[in-house]
A protein has these predicted regions:
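GAF sensory domains
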Residues: 122-191
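Hydrophobic, well-ordered secondary-structure segments
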Residues: 88-91, 103-107, 203
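Amphipathic alpha-helical "output/dimerization" segments
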Residues: 198-214
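A conserved regulatory-domain signal marking ACT and ACT-like small-molecule sensing domains
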Residues: 1-95
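Short alpha-helical interdomain "coupling" segment at the junction between an upstream regulatory sensor module
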Residues: 216-222
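Helix-loop-beta substructure at the N-terminus of cytosolic sensory domains
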Residues: 99-138
């Protein structure tokens, strides 16, 4: 079974090699490594690994944290192969789709691009009430909810402890980030339950992708 391991590691040469060695000695294969961000002497890495049959996920944590200075921020099951060209494929699909289907396609595919749990596209009425234009599988219900940040002028992180969230959502530690889609009254929200919190680098990546997607989705189909 595949897992997505998010590590906070010392930003020094050889550290990923040490992690790879520790995992390999435990019979764990690394599928891919994605450096999310670095600064302040540390780096944040997403590592997709294959866990051998019969091994417990805890063995990933034990092996990783056996390397001095390495901390496991999160461990989640990972469904599907990592595709470094997925963003380009999404944009190409949006270019071929009619505008109304492009929104649904965007919501369906973004969770795979960002290794998140779900995505929704919301439309606001200017007073905080929202309507769901499209939603991926596993997305919670936003219809009729008051979201004080909509209209949205710029992308932002939406932490799980925010006061506007339903109590049930706070208990589930639902982490989100949002970006305008075409106009301040329409926003794309990407979320994951139980964390980890989205990083600033993930938000910047979202801004870039959604900005291009908004332009592509509003063009006539190719």
């Amino acid at each position: 079974m595949s897992y997505l391991l998010r590590l906070v590691v010392p930003d020094r040469p050889g550290i990923l090699g040490a992690v790879a060695t520790a995992l390999g000695e435990s019979g764990i294969d690394i599928v891919s490594v994605d450096v999310l961000e670095r600064g302040g002497g540390v780096a944040v890495d997403d590592i997709v690994v294959d866990l051998p049959p019969g091994r417990l996920p805890d063995s990933l944590i034990t092996a990783s944290q056996g390397v001095p200075g390495v901390q496991v921020e999160s461990l989640r099951p990972f469904a599907g192969p990592l595709d470094t060209h997925r963003e380009l494929e999404l944009l190409e699909s949006l270019a071929r789709a009619a505008e109304w289907t492009a929104v649904k396609l965007l919501a369906a595919e973004l969770p795979r691009v960002f290794h998140s749990g779900w995505a929704v596209v919301l439309s606001g009425d200017g007073e905080g009430l929202c309507e769901v234009l499209a939603a991926s599988d596993a997305a919670p219900t936003f219809d009729g909810m008051t979201v004080p940040w909509l209209p949205l002028s710029s992308a932002r992180l939406l932490p799980s402890e925010a006061d506007w969230l339903p109590e049930r959502w706070r208990e589930m530690a639902i982490e989100m980030m949002a970006a305008p889609f075409g106009s301040p009254r329409t926003a794309v929200v990407i979320g994951r339950s139980g964390g980890p919190a989205f990083r600033r680098s993930e938000l910047l990546r979202m801004v870039h992708l959604i900005g291009i997607a908004a332009s592509v989705a509003h063009l006539p189909p190719a």
